[in-house]
Amino acid sequence: MTPFMTEDFLLDTEFARRLYHDYAKDQPIFDYHCHLPPQQIAEDYRFKNLYDIWLKGDHYKWRAMRTNGVAERLCTGDASDREKFDAWAATVPHTIGNPLYHWTHLELRRPFGITGKLLSPSTADEIWNECNELLAQDNFSARGIMQQMNVKMVGTTDDPIDSLEHHAEIAKDGSFTIKVLPSWRPDKAFNIEQATFNDYMAKLGEVSDTDIRRFADLQTALTKRLDHFAAHGCKVSDHALDVVMFAEANEAELDRILARRLAGETLSEHEVAQFKTAVLVFLGAEYARRGWVQQYHIGALRNNNLRQFKLLGPDVGFDSINDRPMAEELSKLLSKQNEENLLPKTILYCLNPRDNEVLGTMIGNFQGEGMPGKMQFGSGWWFNDQKDGMERQMTQLAQLGLLSRFVGMLTDSRSFLSYTRHEYFRRILCQMIGRWVEAGEAPADINLLGEMVKNICFNNARDYFAIELN
C-alpha cells in the first residue's frame, strides 16, 4: 500500500521520480493567467486568518460545501470566518476523489509545512491555529507567499476601463522582483446582448475620451485602452467565449447594430454574432501587431441558478459545462483573423472535454512559420483542472500536436495558495511520461525527457509570452 501524499505523491515509476525531483520540482512558476487582486499584491496584504486566504471567494469549495448540505450562510453568507472554516473542515473528508482533497492537503503542505495531518473536524482547531500563527509572519504576506513559491511572473485579469494603478505601483517597487502584469479582458465591450452593455459603453467612452456612436468610435476607444495596457507591460488578452459565433458584416451594418443597441433595442442572434465577430477580428489584428497572445476560454454555461444569481451575483459556483457545437464557427473565426496574416499567438481552452480533439486538431490548421507552438491547446480548464482532465488534455495534445511545445500550467485562481496546482500538474506530467518509458513507448533518455519537462514547466511559457523577467 502506498502512503498518502508523500514526497513521491503520484510518482509511480522510478523514471517519474527522477523527472520530478531532478527536473520539474525546482522550476520557477510562470503563472500567465490568474485572478489575483493586484491591489493585494501592491499593498503586500496581510491575511487576517486561514479563512481570509483560503475560503473567501473560492467557488470550488462552496460547490462542494453546498453538495454536502452546508447552509449558504456558511458559504457566502454572514457566518463568522471560523464558522465557515469549520464547515469546510467538516466537508473535506467527503471530498475524497475530488481534486479538492488533493489541493487542500498540498496547500497545507506548501507553504504551511503541515504534513501527515488530514483536515477534518478533529484537526480543525490545530490547523486553524497553526496556519494563523504563520500568517502573522512577514513571509506569509501576499508577496511573501509568492516569493516562497518561486513565482517569477503573474498575469492578472483586468477590464479595459481599469486604471492599472496597482500594477504601476508594483512596477515602481524595485524591492519586489516578481513581474505582475495586467491581462486585457474585454468581455464587457464584446457582450452586446447583455443588459449592462450600454452602461459599459458610457464608461469606456469616458475613460478613452471618445463618444461611442459608431463602430469606428468603439475601435478608437479600444485602441486607446490597448495603448494604456501596453504601457503597463500587458502582453496577453483573455476572452470568455461561452458560445463561439461567426457572422460577417460591413461597416454600415455594424454601425446600425451598435446604434440600435445603444438606443435600447434588442438584437437578433445573427446581429449579436456579427458584432462579436467584428470585435474579435479587430482585436485579434491589434494583438498580432503588438505581439500579444490571445486566449479563448470556450464553453461555459454560466449563472444556471437564476434565484441564486439574483441573490449572490456571478462567479459564486453556479456555472457548468455547455455542449454547444464550436468547430465550424471557431474555424471560420481563426481563418478570418489569418486572412491578412493577423492571427496572433493563440491559446484555446475548452470546458467540455468532448471538444479536446476539436481544439487539438484545430490548432494544427494555423501554426506559424518559424514560431514553435504558435497555436496552443490550453491546459485542462476549470472542471478539467484535475488529474483525469490534465492527463486527457496532455495525452490528446501529444497525439495530435507537440506536447514538447506546450506552455503548461496556470492557476486561473483567486487564491495565493493555489500555486501548488503547478506542483500537482508537474507530478501528473512526470507520472504520465514515466509510464510511457516504463511501457517502452518512450525512450529512457533522462536528458531528452528531462529537458522536455523543464520546458513544459517554465521555459516554453517564458519564451512564448516573450516577457522580460527580473
Curated annotation (Swiss-Prot):
Coiled coil: none
Catalyses which reaction(s): D-glucuronate = D-fructuronate; aldehydo-D-galacturonate = keto-D-tagaturonate
InterPro entries: Metal_Hydrolase, Uronate_isomerase
Membrane-spanning ranges: none
GO molecular function: glucuronate isomerase activity
Disulfide bonds listed in the record: none
Keywords in alphabetical order: Isomerase
EC id: 5.3.1.12
Pfam families: UxaC
Biological or metabolic pathway of the protein: Carbohydrate metabolism; pentose and glucuronate interconversion
Domain of life: Bacteria
A GO BP annotation: D-galacturonate catabolic process
Family: Belongs to the metallo-dependent hydrolases superfamily. Uronate isomerase family.
Protein name: Uronate isomerase
Organism per entry: Escherichia coli O17:K52:H18 (strain UMN026 / ExPEC)
Gene: uxaC
